[in-house]
């Protein structure tokens, strides 16, 4: 099994195997593994954004990727919320599980698709979604642009 397949399968699994694996690695290996995962997540994000743009081209607003969408996770009870945000240190003496079922098939398909996709062959910058309400630098740029626009409108009105 390829190392990236191993990593992605653990990462996408709904357990703490990925954290146990990272805890058992040295810092350099852990950071390298995280970089590998972010490259695949960037590819998935690019696919999602392009798909959203196709939907918007036919007039459908896909709320899950829009700026106004505020809910990322639906919680049926407080236990789900607690599980998601539990920051208890991981015990490293546990066994790492590896799902070799449909999740593993998904990982292999994702890796093949990324390798064969025209999107992956073009040089793209990492895809990041910028939320203007949370990104300070972007918010500052927007404030400058708005203040310049207000000054221009004021000068047009006074002349």
UniProtKB/Swiss-Prot annotation:
Keyword flag Transmembrane helix: no
Induction behaviour: Expressed in the late phase of the viral replicative cycle.
Subcellular location as annotated: Virion; Host cytoplasm
Calcium in keyword set: no
InterPro entries: Poxvirus_J1
Any Pfam family the entry gives: Pox_J1
Keywords: Host cytoplasm, Late protein, Virion
Disulfide bonds: none
GO cellular component, one term: host cell cytoplasm
Family label: Belongs to the orthopoxvirus OPG100 family.
Record text on subunit structure and interactions: Homodimer. Part of a complex composed of the kinase OPG054, OPG092, OPG114, OPG115, OPG142 and OPG157. Interacts with OPG175.
Biological role: Late protein which is a part of a large complex required for early virion morphogenesis. This complex participates in the formation of virosomes and the incorporation of virosomal contents into nascent immature virions. Plays a role in DNA packaging during immature virions (IV) formation.
Name of the protein described by the UniProt record: Virion assembly protein OPG100
Gene (UniProt): OPG100
């Amino acid at each position: 099994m390829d190392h990236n397949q191993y990593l992605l399968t653990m990462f996408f699994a709904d357990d703490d195997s990925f954290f146990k694996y990272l805890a058992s690695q040295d810092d350099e290996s852990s950071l390298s593994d995280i970089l590998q995962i972010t490259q695949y997540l960037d590819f998935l994000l690019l696919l999602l954004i392009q798909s959203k743009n196709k939907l918007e081209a036919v007039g459908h607003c896909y709320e899950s990727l829009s700026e106004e969408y505020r809910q990322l996770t639906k919680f049926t009870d407080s236990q789900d919320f607690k599980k998601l945000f539990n920051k208890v240190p991981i015990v490293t003496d546990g066994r790492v599980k590896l799902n070799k079922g449909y999740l593993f098939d998904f990982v292999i398909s994702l890796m093949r698709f990324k390798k064969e996709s025209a999107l992956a062959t073009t040089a793209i910058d990492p895809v990041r979604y910028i939320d203007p309400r949370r990104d300070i630098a972007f918010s500052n740029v927007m404030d400058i642009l708005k203040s310049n626009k207000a000054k221009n409108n004021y000068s047009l009105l006074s002349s």
